[in-house]
């Protein structure tokens, strides 16, 4: 099964050492009691992947691994088959020894929108809440992060992350833990915390903001990306049963209202740095994610609306800071 021992060793002598009081038993219980019915199938594909160490690794402009001399056609086909066993791939893209994982989301586009507005990540300890397959963790490592820790309870995403890690030479600068933020103690240890595409899934969005704040060191930075609507500080959409075919969407505030929420939770220096309509070029069906995607979630007669009649997805990026001396 998944071995978290390297992570435990890495945090034993740093600001996350107190997490070891609870984390090992928590993850041990998870492995014994909470595995998904398909986990063994996913893990089997992961185990059969070759351990490769790239001779060329680009984490600055993409997540691309190459090797010289190149692997054979048969090896490449074998890798692709095993990676396809881990479908659907939602967050990426990845290019691994000639296997191009064309994911549902162009997560690199989101990163391009976020990166110019945040504090440099060099030498920072980072938490990414709802990290998915870990694409952005590798981009954070590319920016010089000391360590990028992702949490996401979806076990397929953990297997996808571990598959990519194995093909990147067992790189230990990034880690994914199968946890939700409500399962974390108040660590107050991370220099930067990312929450991208999570807030609208929370029944209590202000509680989520408090949870994020409790993971930051004093003066640490929050990077928040979420769905928003147009309007003033009093505008919040509370969808019915579904929004863009998603069942678990609870609150979509205006960007200005979200600023007020952050300030109410004690954040300072709150900035709206980007607002962008999600397009069917950024989120779409591919041969690595073959079910419905954004095009099917929009009104075919009016793409400015969802199939339910709500405003089509628009996402904002906000940056804020926990009080304390700037890092």
From Swiss-Prot:
Q: Which residues bind carboxy-S-adenosyl-L-methionine?
A: 91, 105, 110, 130, 181-182, 196, 200, 315
What's an example GO BP annotation here?
A: tRNA wobble uridine modification
Q: Which GO terms describe its molecular function?
A: transferase activity, transferring alkyl or aryl (other than methyl) groups
Q: What is the organism field in this record? A: Pectobacterium atrosepticum (strain SCRI 1043 / ATCC BAA-672)
Q: Which UniProt keywords apply?
A: Transferase, tRNA processing
Source organism, top-level taxon: Bacteria
Q: What is its EC number?
A: 2.5.1.-
SUPFAM superfamilies noted in UniProt = S-adenosyl-L-methionine-dependent methyltransferases
Q: Which gene encodes it?
A: cmoB
Family statement: Belongs to the class I-like SAM-binding methyltransferase superfamily. CmoB family.
Q: Which protein, by its recorded name, is this?
A: tRNA U34 carboxymethyltransferase
Q: Say what the protein does.
A: Catalyzes carboxymethyl transfer from carboxy-S-adenosyl-L-methionine (Cx-SAM) to 5-hydroxyuridine (ho5U) to form 5-carboxymethoxyuridine (cmo5U) at position 34 in tRNAs.
Record keywords: Repeat included? no
Q: Subunit structure of this entry?
A: Homotetramer.
Cite the InterPro entries for this sequence.
Answer: CmoB, Mo5U34_MeTrfas-like, SAM-dependent_MTases_sf
Quickly give the catalysed reaction: carboxy-S-adenosyl-L-methionine + 5-hydroxyuridine(34) in tRNA = 5-carboxymethoxyuridine(34) in tRNA + S-adenosyl-L-homocysteine + H(+)
């Amino acid at each position: 099964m998944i071995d978290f021992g390297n992570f435990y060793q890495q945090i034993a002598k740093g600001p996350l050492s107190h997490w070891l009081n609870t984390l090992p038993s928590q993850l041990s219980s998870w492995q014994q009691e909470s595995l998904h019915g398909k986990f063994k199938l996913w893990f089997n594909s992961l185990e059969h992947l070759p351990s490769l160490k790239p001779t060329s690794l680009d984490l600055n402009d993409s997540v691309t691994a190459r090797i010289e001399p190149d692997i054979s056609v048969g090896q490449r086909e074998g890798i692709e088959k095993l990676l396809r066993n881990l479908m659907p791939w939602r967050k990426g893209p990845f290019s691994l020894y000639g296997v191009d994982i064309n994911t549902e989301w162009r997560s690199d586009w989101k990163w391009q929108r976020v990166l110019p507005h945040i504090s440099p990540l060099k030498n920072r300890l980072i938490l990414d809440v709802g990290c998915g397959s870990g694409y952005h963790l590798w981009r954070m490592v590319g920016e010089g992060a000391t360590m990028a820790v992702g949490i996401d309870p979806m076990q397929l995403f953990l297997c996808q992350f571990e598959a990519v890690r194995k093909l990147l030479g067992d790189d230990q600068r990034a880690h994914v833990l199968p946890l939700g933020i409500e399962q974390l103690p108040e660590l107050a240890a991370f220099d930067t915390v990312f929450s991208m595409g999570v807030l609208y899934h929370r029944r209590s969005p202000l509680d989520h903001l408090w949870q994020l704040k409790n993971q930051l060191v004093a003066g640490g930075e929050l990077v928040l990306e979420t769905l928003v609507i147009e309007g003033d500080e009093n505008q919040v959409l509370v969808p019915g049963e579904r929004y863009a075919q998603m069942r678990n969407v609870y609150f979509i505030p205006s960007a200005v209202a979200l600023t007020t929420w952050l300030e109410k939770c004690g954040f300072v220096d709150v900035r709206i740095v980007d607002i962008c309509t999600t397009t069917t070029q950024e989120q779409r069906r591919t041969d690595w994610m073959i079910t419905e995607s954004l095009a099917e979630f929009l009104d075919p007669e009016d793409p400015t609306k969802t199939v339910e009649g709500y405003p089509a997805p628009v996402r904002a990026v906000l940056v804020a800071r926990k009080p304390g001396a700037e890092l």
